A protein has these predicted regions:
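Short strand-coil-strand connectors
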Residues: 7, 20-22, 60
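Short beta-strand-centered aromatic/proline hotspots
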Residues: 22-37
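Intrinsically disordered, low-complexity, charged/polar segments
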Residues: 48-84
Length: 84
């Protein structure tokens, strides 16, 4: 699946976003095979098997939310290598 925000930008690991009004960061994107360096291959395989498609968000308060695809409450803010 081609993961994109409703605004059309591709979803990538490290993106800064707003989800339900709360700041968050995209931790990984299964569909693009984008993972943090410290995530084991075993963990990656489990995510692929359990979820198949989607991405994980981590909010500033530490809460993690898995989404199978973008929804109307998810807004792109900036790429990881750009200033917010």
């Amino acid at each position: 699946m081609d993961q994109r925000y409703y605004s059309g930008e591709e979803i990538h690991m490290g993106d800064r976003v707003q989800f339900c009004g709360c700041p968050a960061t995209v931790v990984f994107v299964i569909d693009r095979d984008e993972w943090p360096d410290d995530q084991s291959e075993e963990s990656r395989d489990w995510e692929r098997k359990e979820n198949g498609s989607g991405f994980l968000l981590r909010q500033e308060n530490g809460a993690c939310i898995f989404l199978p695809e973008a929804d109307e409450d998810l807004f792109f803010v900036s790429r990881a290598n750009n200033a917010a």
